[in-house]
Each structure stands twice: as C-alpha cells, then as structure tokens.
A protein has these predicted regions:
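Bacterial Sec-dependent N-terminal signal peptides
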Residues: 1-20
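Residue-level detector of conserved, function-critical positions
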Residues: 18-200
C-alpha cells in the first residue's frame, strides 16, 4: 500500500516536460522549432519545450540579423560531413533523420520547398598506366533541388572545374545564385551580369 501511495504522488511529476539547463544559446522559433546550443553542439526544441533533435555537431549555422544558428525551413535543416577532407552538405528532418545525404559542395536553406546547391560530377577522362588509376575530373554546377534532393534545374550550364585538393585548402565554393521569389532565381554569369531564371 505504501508503494502505491508513493507511485500516486509521483505521477504528476512524471508528466512534466524535461527541463533543459545550462544552455549557451536559444534562438527564436522558426518553422515551429528553436535551435538550442550546449557547448559546441546544437539541438532543436518544439514549441512545448521538448527536445526533438538531440544535440549534435554537424548542424550548419545560418547567419541572421542577430546571430548565427542552425534553422529549419520547410522541415529541412542543413548538415555538413567531412569525406576525405572535403565538406559535403545535406539535410535532416525534424526527427533528426538524414533525408538528403551529404553530397553537395555547398547548399542553401530551403525556401518554398526548393534550395540551391553545388552538385559535384565526377568524370573519368582516362587511365594512368603507371599509377594504375583512373584519371578523373571533378566539376560542379549550381542546381535547384527539391525536398528529396532531386535536381529540378541546372542554374549554371558551364561546369566549374575543381579538384578535391583545392577544396580541402580553400573551403566550400560560394553559391552565387539566389532566389528572388518563389519561382525566380537570379543567376550571376561569368561576366558578373545577372540573369533571371524561372523555376517550375
């Protein structure tokens, strides 16, 4: 009987949401969630204060007017992973699951269910008999992707050549195109002039 009474007294306390303490930063809510920082890791809470994405170190921060923190847009948040010394970008959902594997040299946050990314293409251009290896060329295009990571449209038709060694030394290439409305993208050409492209 004593155990039963103790159990009844504990029930109200078990229903209380977890308390998150010793946080270094709490962002404003965006897309129904807020980023929280503890040490060098970020996580996300929902509007009830429940931790929905556990603390992790691969979330990409976005520069805002007031601070830098990871954000969700259209149920997607940028992540970055190193592969062979090169940083590749992908996306997670609000359950913390990787929904677009890190594969892009750079990427933007989603906006109206679309994002701009630098997609890498690897082309075998020959074979080196001395080293017994394929000779490969890497180039990338600016592309618009949907929420599954599928390419909707190529923004740059001319491939920009890059070697993984150069990326290791200089960091992620810059995305020059930008959304100016839900279906219009401003694309910067090689002559530093802009063109407007409609994305369906």
């Amino acid at each position: 009987m004593k155990k039963f009474v103790i159990a009844l007294l504990l029930i109200p306390y078990l229903g209380i949401a977890q308390t998150l303490e010793n946080l270094d930063y709490i962002s404003p809510f965006n897309d129904g969630v807020a980023a929280i920082k503890k040490g060098n890791e970020w996580g996300f809470i929902d509007q009830e204060g429940k931790l929905i994405v556990d603390f992790r170190n691969d979330l990409v921060v976005t520069k805002t007017d007031n601070a830098n923190y990871p954000i969700f847009e259209d149920d997607r948040c940028l992540i970055a992973h190193h592969k062979d010394g090169v940083l590749y970008y992908g996306y997670i959902n609000k359950e913390g699951e990787t929904v677009i594997a890190p594969q892009f040299l750079n990427a933007t946050n989603f906006n109206n269910k679309k994002a701009i990314a630098l997609k890498v293409h690897k082309e075998t251009i020959g074979y080196n008999d001395i080293f017994k290896k394929d000779v490969v060329s890497y180039h990338y295009f600016e592309v618009v992707i949907d929420k599954t990571g599928t390419t909707i449209d190529h923004l740059t038709q001319l491939a920009l050549h890059v070697s993984p060694q150069n990326i290791k030394n200089s960091g992620s290439p810059t995305i020059t195109s930008k959304f100016i409305s839900a279906n219009l993208v401003a694309v910067k050409g090689n002559n530093s002039k802009w063109q407007i492209k409609k994305i369906d």
